Curated annotation (Swiss-Prot):
The lineage of its organism: Eukaryota, Amoebozoa, Evosea, Eumycetozoa, Dictyostelia. It is a multi-pass membrane protein. May be involved in protein transport along the secretory pathway. It holds the Pfam family Rer1. GO terms for cellular component: endoplasmic reticulum; Golgi membrane. It comes from the Eukaryota. Belongs to the RER1 family. This is Protein RER1 homolog. Keywords: Membrane, Protein transport, Transmembrane, Transmembrane helix, Transport. The chain crosses the membrane at residues 33-53, 61-81, 115-135, 136-156. InterPro entries: Rer1 (IPR004932).
Amino acid sequence: MPTTIDEGLPAPHNFVSFTTLIARKYQNLIEKTISFIPQRWAFVGFLSFLYILRVSLSSGGWYVITYALGIFLLTRFIAFLSPKWDPELEEDSGDSLPTTLNRNDDEAKPFIRRLPEFLFWHSIFKALFISIFCTFIPFLDLPVFWPILLLYFIIIFSVTMKKQIKHMIKYKYIPFTVGKKTYTKNNS
């Protein structure tokens, strides 16, 4: 009988079973963190601090890695702010059958995100972890003129956020909610 690792699982005999075991343990650990929202985001903040500290204290600039991380985080943030079903696309499709006779555009509709909060957090966590790892690989510190990357990122950020805010105003949705509104009984 092969030796066992914790939880009574058989010891891995080859690389595939070892990676499967690691993937299962990672998935189990990630799933245990679902209900700990403030702690998860605090850990992402800590990873961000570690990344900034690593980049600022190292001899290289890591400009390309930082730029790629910024662009990735921007795309994830836009997906987090976007509704799952784009009202602009639904408006254009005139071939579908109407579901109600009188359609009220002021009707309250729930906001469902294209990228849920947990997946948003998980993608940021993985991106920061990979970025920190990449700063330990010397050949990834490419020599670039960083002000151009910074200017380009600022332009991309401002254009995409302006477009997203206009979309939010046009279709009257607010992606930031704190939950269901509760009413209290007034004793006076």
